[in-house]
């Protein structure tokens, strides 16, 4: 597996064409989504003070985020994009995480988000309409 992952590092345009490579790509995509969200979401930590137990938040609280937008080759070409995207959401095995608890999963299959950010500076309504049309909706996740 290590050799195949190393090969993928230098062949970033490769789209899996067999079950083994699809499984490796799936695992890498899940890990990437989980890592990316972990870097953005904060956490709650128990701290003991002279007044007793309290919680300290570090980072951003994303628990109430309504939408998670995913993009990238491993996600837009995957057979199980929705399953991979769920790694962005709260997981009970990490109760201190401040990841989104419930969110609608959206997929940017055409890589338009950056362009829409630029377009929105002059034409916000046009950018919004294009995004609503082009970004795929996977529904509400829990």
Residue positions per predicted region:
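Helical "lid/coupling" subdomains associated with nucleotide-phosphate turnover
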Residues: 1-142
């Amino acid at each position: 597996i290590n050799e195949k992952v190393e090969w993928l590092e230098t062949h970033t345009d490769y789209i899996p064409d067999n079950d083994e490579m699809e499984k490796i790509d799936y695992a890498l995509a899940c890990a990437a989504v989980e890592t990316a969200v972990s870097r953005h979401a904060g956490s709650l930590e128990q701290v003991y003070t002279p007044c007793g137990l309290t919680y300290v938040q570090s980072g951003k609280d994303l628990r109430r985020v309504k939408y998670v937008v995913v993009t990238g080759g491993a996600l837009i070409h995957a057979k199980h994009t929705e399953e991979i995207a769920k790694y962005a959401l709260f997981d009970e095995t990490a109760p201190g995480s401040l990841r989104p608890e419930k969110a609608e999963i959206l997929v940017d299959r055409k890589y338009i988000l950056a362009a829409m950010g630029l377009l929105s500076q002059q034409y916000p309504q046009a950018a919004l309409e294009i995004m609503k049309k082009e970004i795929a909706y996977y529904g509400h996740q829990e």
